[in-house]
Structures are given as structure tokens and as C-alpha cells.
Amino acid sequence: MSGSTVPAGAVVPEAHTIETFQPPREMLQNHPSKPHLANFEEYQKLYKQSITEPNVFWAERARELLSWSKDFQTVHSGSLANGDNAWFVEGELNASYNCVDRHAHKDPNRVAIIYEADEPGQGRNVTYGELLREVSKLAHVLTNLGVRKGDTVAIYLPMIPEAIVAMLACTRIGAIHSVVFAGFSSDSLRDRVVDAQSKVVITTDEGKRGGKLIGTKKIVDEALQQCPDVRNVLVYKRTGADISMTPGRDLWWHEEVEKYPAYYTPVAMASEDPLFLLYTSGSTGKPKGVAHSTGGYLLGAAMTGKYVFDIHDGDRYFCGGDVGWITGHTYVLYAPLLLGVSTVVFEGTPAYPNFSRYWDIIEEHKVTQFYVAPTALRLLKRAGDHHVRNEMKHLRVLGSVGEPIAAEVWKWYYDVVGKGRAQICDTYWQTETGSNVITPLAGVTPTKPGSASFPFFGIEPALVDPVTGEEIHGNDVEGVLAFKQPWPSMARTVWGAHKRYMETYLHVYKGYYFTGDGAARDHEGFYWIRGRVDDVVNVSGHRLSTAEIEAALIEHHSIAEAAVVGVADELTGQAVNAFVAVKEGTQINDALRKEFVLQVRRSIGPFAAPKAIYIVPDLPKTRSGKIMRRILRKIVAGEEDQLGDITTLSDPSVVAKIIDVVHAQRQ
């Protein structure tokens, strides 16, 4: 324990009462070798070097973890203030060579991809040797379709091995992959194809997810009605559905790859050449195509895979993220394959055909690292512990990604899923950071439930006063989270809009990278992420983090999920409105709502008490699991006609149900 009395004015009160967990003894005892660092002191020493001598630190790591066809001399040039950062400047390398060839040459029969299809038992394994052949053949196809170095290719594929093959085939020929999540609407797809100027789109006849069919090709056809510059659509046959094929434009993947040899010489890329574009949410305004470089991004992926997740030879890594998001890019594809281990590609959902699906996959494939969003964990915790019937004794690391994980969900993950044998790594990062930036290192870092713990190598956090723009020093402080130094895997620009990149990330506080998130540093130096700066409610001069109020609400035994938004209030400036989904079998009445308000009063204080609590069947979420608080804000503000594109939600029908609840309660 960190001590059970909370000093007056403590910025992170929970840090004083919550238990600090050391890396589990059983994890270290049963380790196939040992963690890459001896102890926390070694992390501190290396971390210090990464901040004071970044060029020495990163040059050594880049040469150790990546294979360069041409060495670099200049480790880093540019600055945050100027937005012209470049790493390993003269170096040349190829991403697909680093992810595939070098492992295939050593051991072609080593499994690269463990494909777990939507229907259990229908998956297959792909070895590094097979992956090299498949990537090479598709590289020939793309070249034959006129795709050249520096061109973008749009990939609209579900979670199947071909998504990995397509991404790597692009990198092999020097093309830039632009993956669009295969759940986005045709309008969202169109916007991304147009913005990236992609001439080729890769998709499937259909997708399968959670027992349902998704008409991916149909969506592509709709999107392309307004994309005259697209020359070809390459279609992978996933279900064999009867689909329309446009002659001269549409081609079958299986027919095209048969025409070409099983090897394609990888194209040498400059370290700073763009590797991929990934569009961050276009739910407000035009989507931003975040552009990542080749050398720096690959190093960030390999470094965090090695040190955060303790990846060792022979591991089997399972990230539940989708390649349509940054989590799937970095931790389904790049980190595991750069390190030459097996990565699980899971097509389905955690609830299909039942709530044991994740645990069955982990058990069957002897998974060593598992990485998933708190949304999925809340769903599975809500479903009941009896679903977690597997031993899963090979698990060493349990990662969490996408949003802060509430303490009780953290403990459930640790006790029920990990059985106290696996370390929890609550990782903080963003599409723009490329890889984990504040995170524990498995087997090394002490952890506190709810805290992302300490910065990764090369990341120098600063908490900035949002009013003065000055850095706030010392511990037991909070502010806006920014970074003081560039790091290799940071995004280099917004595609075709460098000014927007500068204004969004680098000019908010000159000389800093601005994350847009609030954070606190507790009395022991642990970092606590407090949610988006715009997810702050100001009630009677009290700045309240919505994440904090949500965490207080879900401490109540009846609440499965909660989302909090601020709504304009004549008296207090803003008032707290809460939307909660309750566990099955809960009796809904006014007494229960009062209990929920009391829960927040007790946990945070009377000023944080929600003015209204809406009990809803579910919350509006994107398919990556993020709660769309923007939609809830519009509903409570009576702006239901300005909700924007809700087709990107995992279940758009939930919006009408929420509106009904709000109307009924206000009458």
C-alpha cells in the first residue's frame, strides 16, 4: 500500500490509498528466459540516457533492432518548434524485409500469423516462408497495376491474414498504405480515398464479424461513385458471395497473384519516406491523414514490443485491435513481426459465439501477451467470471489500450484473467505517437491500477498550465500533457496539410508536442491520464475530469459502463450529465438513480454530483470501442439534428434509444 490516509489537496487522491503491484513473482519464475531489463533501476538509468543523450541511445537501438540496407550518419535533425523532425537521415531500409525476409531466411517454417476466423475452428496458420511468397506475389500485382513508390493504396479489409499481406506488399514496393477500417461507411471511405489520392483499393467480397456478414465490396462500390481517379479494385474472395464486378476496374486477388513469381526484390526506402497514412476520426470536420515515416516508426514498434510487452523468441502475441486503427498497425502487424514472433489475427468479436472467445483463443494458441481495450474488458467483466474458465498459464503480459482502465476493471483483469501471474500494462499513446509513450515495462515496472505509470524511452513528459502555457514542475500536480523532445515514431505531418499538423500538435504550446489530454503526476511520480482536455466539465469553478466521474460511477455494483458529459447550466456554468448502462437484471427506479448520484458525491465530492442520470441500454461507441461523448453532448443540448455521421458507430440504432430515454425523463 502507498499509505491509506489522503493528504488534503492531493491531486491524485486514489494514488495514496491504492495498492502498488510489483511484477508478479510467478511471471518471473515461469519466464522462458528473463525480462530484457534486470530491474526498475536499469530502466531509470537507460531512460536518463535516452533523454540526455538521445542520439547515442537511439542510434544503438536502431542498429540492433532493424536491418538497414544503407547505414545512417545523422541520428536526428530538426525540432518540435519547426515541425521538421527527421531520424536516421541517410539510412535506407525496407519494412517488409524487416518484418518478413530476415525471419523467413532464418526459419521459413516459423509461424508468422495465427489466423483465428470469425467461426471457431476455421482459421489457419501462415509461416514466415509462406508470408514472404504471398507478400511478393501481391507486390508484383500492385506494380503491374501501375502502383509506384510514393503512391498511396487504400486498404478496406477485415481482420484476415490478407490485410497484413496487403500492407506489407505496399511497403515492399515503396507504396504508402492507407488502411480504412472495414466498418466505416461509404462516405467515410470516399473521403479517405479522395484525400489520400489512392488509385487502387483492396477489399473483400464480404466480411464476417460476430456471425454477421458485412458487404465490404458493396460499400466500396458506393464510395467509388465519387472517386473517378480510382483505376482498380482488387477483391479477395472471403465468403464467395455473388457480387458485382466492374469490368476493366475490378480484379480478383486469387486470379491476379497466380500470374506472378514468389519473390519480389524489396525496394530500398529512405528512413524518412512515408510508410503509411492513417486517418484519425473524421467525426468532426475533415479527417486527418496522419503520416508516419519508415525508420522511426518501425523502431518505435520494435522497441515497445520488446520492452513494454517483454517479447521473446517463440512468443505468441495476441492484440485484439483491428488493423483499421493504429493499435492494429503497431501491435498486430509491426511490433510482433519485426521481432519475428507469431501474431494472432482475430476476425471476430469477444462475444461470438460466446463470451469465452478471447480466453479460448489464448488457451488454444498458448498466447503469451494479450492486448485489448477496456471497453472489451468491461463487456467481459459484465458477462460474468464463469466465462473465464481457462487456465491460460502461458500468459505473461496483459495490456490495455485506448483509454484509462478503471481500477476495478484493472483488478478483475489481474485476478480473474491473469490469476495474479501476468503483469498488467496500461499503455498510453495515440495514432500520432506511433507507439506506446507512457507505459509500464512488463517484468520491470511497479504499477498502480488506473495509472499508465512512467514514460517510455525518449519521451520527456511535461504537465503544462493550460492558462499560462508554463510547465508545472514537481510531483502531486496536474495539467495538460505535452512532450518536450521529439522521438523516432512520432507522426511527421498531416497528409497534404502540414499547417494543420503544426497548429494541432506543435503550436498549441510552442516547443512542445501537445497531446490534447490532461494528466496528473502523483506524489511518487506515476502518471495518471485524465482524458481529453475537452472532456473536462467546469462546474462552479471546479474543473472535473469526465473520466474521473465515470470511474466513480462504475464503482457501483449495478453499473457496467458510464459516459459523462458537460451540459450548459444557468447556475453553475456547466452541469454533469451521466449516461449509464446497468448490468442485466438490475431494477431501474428513482432510488437507484439517487444511489448513483450518492456514489459520485462519496467518491469525488458533492460538486461532482451528476445533475441528471440517464439509464440507457448501451452507449454510442465506434467500432474500435471509443465512447462517442460528442453524440451524447449533442443529445443533451437538444441538437439531435446535428449528430453528424453515426454510421461509424458499432451500433447506430442505439442513438435513437438514447434520445427516447432523454425525452422521456425530461417530460
From Swiss-Prot:
Molecular-function annotations in GO? acetate-CoA ligase activity; AMP binding; ATP binding
> Is-annotated flag, keyword ATP-binding?
yes
Going by the UniProt record, its keywords in alphabetical order are: ATP-binding, Ligase, Nucleotide-binding
**PROSITE patterns in UniProt:** AMP_BINDING
State what induces this protein: By acetate.
Q: Which organism is it from?
A: Neurospora crassa (strain ATCC 24698 / 74-OR23-1A / CBS 708.71 / DSM 1257 / FGSC 987)
- Enzyme Commission identifier(s): 6.2.1.1
Q: Which reaction is catalysed here?
A: acetate + ATP + CoA = acetyl-CoA + AMP + diphosphate
Tell me the residue numbers annotated for binding ATP: 402-404, 426-431, 517, 532, 543
Q: Where does CoA bind?
A: 209-212, 327, 540, 601
- Family of the protein in this entry: Belongs to the ATP-dependent AMP-binding enzyme family.
Instruction: Write down the top EC class of this protein.
Output: ligase
Annotated InterPro entries:
Ac_CoA_lig, ACAS_N, AMP-bd_C, AMP-bd_C_sf, AMP-binding_CS, AMP-dep_synth/lig_dom, ANL_N_sf
Q: Which gene encodes it?
A: acu-5
Query: Which Gene Ontology biological process is one annotated for this entry?
Result: acetyl-CoA biosynthetic process from acetate
- Lineage: superkingdom: Eukaryota
Tell me what this protein is called. Acetyl-coenzyme A synthetase
Its GO CC terms are: cytosol; nucleus
